[in-house]
Amino acid sequence: MDIKPEKYKPIKEEYIKSFKDMLLLRRFEEKCGQLYGMGKIGGFCHLYIGQEAVISAVAMIKKKGDSTITSYRDHAHIILAGTEPKYVLAELMGRATGCSKGKGGSMHLFDIPNKFYGGHGIVGAQVPIGTGLAFAEKYNGTNNICFTFLGDGAVNQGQVYEAFNMASLWGLPIVYIIENNEYSMGTSVARSTFMCDLYKKGESFGIRGFQLDGMDFEEMYNGTKQVAEYVRENSFPVILEVKTYRYRGHSMSDPAKYRSKEEVEKYKERDTLVRIREIILDNKYATEADLKAIEQSVREIIKVAVEFSENSPLPAEDELYTEIYV
């Protein structure tokens, strides 16, 4: 297969939805950063600010029944899988009402009814699990596919290549999406892997790969939709490398001194949220007043999430002894 340019273009309603989705993710993550600084969120916390176009496009072309699994930078993925932000924030704040009962925290978010299978703290560990999810779909004879997200740092993990081999050998319906934000913690791609074209990493297993601009919602929408169609129709894996960028450090404890302010500002000039807003206004898909109303509704969602989380109880002590399997 090949990705045809502009085969699919979002319609008016999808542009507006993408703006609302990305704005919600941006404001949610900003609030998480604020609450972390206030000591109300503990442990590790990895923000998704800057990368919103990736999951926004994928979530839009997903079909009911498809599954999602990702790494520890997972807040955005679970929200667009269908989990209400208040349950996600409650989990980050360690409350019993959280999506993982307050025991998972930022890196281990789960929502099985919405087929979101984590949130995994071990680099690359989600890839063989996602491959197993795709195996289950094929075994059960469904027409569902699995979207497995990983970072550029995970592509050097041995288990990733074992998963690639199994997926191609058994013809599994899975899309591996490499979110290449240029740094695995503080190490650039060029310093950690010999072949920097990460979409080619599956070639020895017969897996086609494609590279998309993860800062461009329209390109993400068009490319991901074509790839998903191919995987669904042919039950065979595809690798998507999406070139994106995180505006914040690797985690809340990372000052990101390994990159210059000029580099960060260069990417912010292409901010996907600003671009989508411009497209909507230029094409008269909505008015400035309409977008301000969306902004107000997002503020209300965040406010409700904070109030719900702060008023929720901590887990009962006996929860320490549940869901222990080893």
From Swiss-Prot:
InterPro entries: DH_E1 (IPR001017), PDH_E1_Alpha_Subunit (IPR050642), Pyrv_DH_E1_asu_subgrp-y (IPR017597), THDP-binding (IPR029061). Pfam families: E1_dh. Its EC number is 1.2.4.1. GO terms for cellular component: intracellular membrane-bounded organelle. Gene3D superfamilies: 3.40.50.970. It comes from the Bacteria. The keyword Protein biosynthesis does not apply. The keyword Oxidoreductase applies. Keywords: Oxidoreductase, Pyruvate, Thiamine pyrophosphate. One of its GO terms (biological process) is pyruvate decarboxylation to acetyl-CoA. It catalyses: N(6)-[(R)-lipoyl]-L-lysyl-[protein] + pyruvate + H(+) = N(6)-[(R)-S(8)-acetyldihydrolipoyl]-L-lysyl-[protein] + CO2. Its cofactor is thiamine diphosphate. One of its GO terms (molecular function) is pyruvate dehydrogenase (acetyl-transferring) activity. The pyruvate dehydrogenase complex catalyzes the overall conversion of pyruvate to acetyl-CoA and CO(2). It contains multiple copies of three enzymatic components: pyruvate dehydrogenase (E1), dihydrolipoamide acetyltransferase (E2) and lipoamide dehydrogenase (E3). Heterodimer of an alpha and a beta chain. This is Pyruvate dehydrogenase E1 component subunit alpha. The gene is pdhA.
